[in-house]
Amino acid sequence: MNDLVPLSSLKVGTTCKIDSILTDEHMRRRLLDLGFSSGTIIKCVQYSPSGDPIAYMLRGTIIALRKEDAGDILVQEGGGHAWD
């Protein structure tokens, strides 16, 4: 089993599966509404020139998150396609 890492630590091109979201209820609800839920396959697609925000592909959509918010999402690297 792979170790869990923060979503914000992924390199461009890395695909992973969301394990958990460790943030306050308001932000958790917002992330869930955007499709960031446990078991979702997600891919890091681009860093902005300054490194923040970071763009991720999940469920056929590209969404940018602030590095701070992405750090609250724990993922398991490997497998799957971000567009599944």
Regions found by a protein language model. Give the residues of each.
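Generic secondary-structure boundary/loop-capping signal
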Residues: 4-7, 28, 62, 70-72
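C-terminal structural segments of small proteins and small subunits
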Residues: 55-84
